[in-house]
């Protein structure tokens, strides 16, 4: 695959054989971003789990202290009073059977979903659409709830879901290139702590196998997976 001149120039600044500290990786991510817009900073983590086994699935939610730099569009499956609460809380799309029908017709202009428990039978009709995209409401992530206003507010404020894929990889957004290094590292630290906290007891051996920082359309920056503490020591505010 042919890379752009800007990408190649950025890649030349990165030693692919090194393991950078998270702080140095955050600096490089900001320095090597080659897009003209405010690029997203993403972290890819290879976990030492076998997600084909139910007792080694890794999933959860975390509230990033500085958000992701993007206001996610939230769709809520609710009716009556709960629908009104969701709308008041800032949900972008609210509905019941009508929303299910729109999604069946191809509507997917949202980044997260929330549902009240009584709507889940209806949402089940579109599980094959939402599930593969990581958009299915789930009690384990707190997105099947009667407290729709709080959950919508949390998502809008920076709460993200994470889930390991079939290859054992997990992807999280920790901010934008415009964020300070301190903000990126604080978000990374909070997310990493939660990922470590939910380590399956059945997972044996090394849990954090590989960590890579990257910006949108930018080269990967290898990060030392053993650096999980005191990440902010030298970070400027």
UniProtKB/Swiss-Prot annotation:
CDD domains: Ribosomal_L1. The keyword tRNA-binding applies. GO terms for cellular component: large ribosomal subunit. GO terms for biological process: regulation of translation; translation. GO terms for molecular function: rRNA binding; structural constituent of ribosome; tRNA binding. It comes from the Bacteria. Coiled coil: none annotated. InterPro entries: Ribosom_uL1_bac-type, Ribosomal_uL1, Ribosomal_uL1-like, Ribosomal_uL1/biogenesis, Ribosomal_uL1_3-a/b-sand, Ribosomal_uL1_CS. It holds the Pfam family Ribosomal_L1. Keywords: Repressor, Ribonucleoprotein, Ribosomal protein, RNA-binding, rRNA-binding, Translation regulation, tRNA-binding. Disulfide bonds: none annotated. Binds directly to 23S rRNA. The L1 stalk is quite mobile in the ribosome, and is involved in E site tRNA release. Protein L1 is also a translational repressor protein, it controls the translation of the L11 operon by binding to its mRNA. Part of the 50S ribosomal subunit. Belongs to the universal ribosomal protein uL1 family. HAMAP family: Ribosomal_uL1_B. This is Large ribosomal subunit protein uL1. It comes from Parafrankia sp. (strain EAN1pec). The lineage of its organism: Bacteria, Bacillati, Actinomycetota, Actinomycetes, Frankiales. The gene is rplA.
């Amino acid at each position: 695959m042919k890379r752009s001149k800007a990408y190649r120039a950025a890649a030349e600044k990165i030693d692919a054989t090194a393991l950078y500290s998270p702080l140095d990786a955050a600096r490089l991510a900001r320095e090597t971003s080659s897009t003209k817009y405010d690029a997203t900073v993403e972290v890819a983590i290879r976990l030492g789990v076998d997600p084909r086994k139910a007792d080694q699935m890794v999933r959860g939610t975390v509230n990033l202290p500085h958000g992701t730099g993007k206001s996610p569009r939230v769709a809520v499956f609710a009716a009556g009073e709960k629908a009104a609460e969701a709308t008041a809380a800032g949900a972008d799309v609210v509905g019941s059977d009508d929303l299910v029908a729109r999604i069946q017709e191809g509507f997917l202009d949202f980044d997260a979903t929330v549902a009240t428990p009584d709507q889940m039978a209806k949402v089940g009709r579109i599980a094959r659409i939402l599930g593969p995209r990581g958009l299915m409401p789930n009690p384990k992530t707190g997105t099947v709830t009667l407290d729709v206003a709080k959950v919508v507010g949390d998502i809008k404020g920076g709460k993200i879901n994470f889930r390991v894929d079939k290859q054992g990889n997990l992807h999280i957004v920790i901010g934008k290139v415009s964020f300070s290094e301190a903000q990126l590292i604080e978000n990374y630290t909070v997310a990493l702590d939660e990922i470590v906290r939910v380590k399956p007891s059945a997972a044996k051996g090394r849990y954090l196998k590989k960590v890579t920082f990257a910006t949108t359309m930018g080269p990967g920056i290898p990060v030392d997976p053993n650096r999980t503490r005191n990440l902010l020591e030298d970070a400027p505010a």
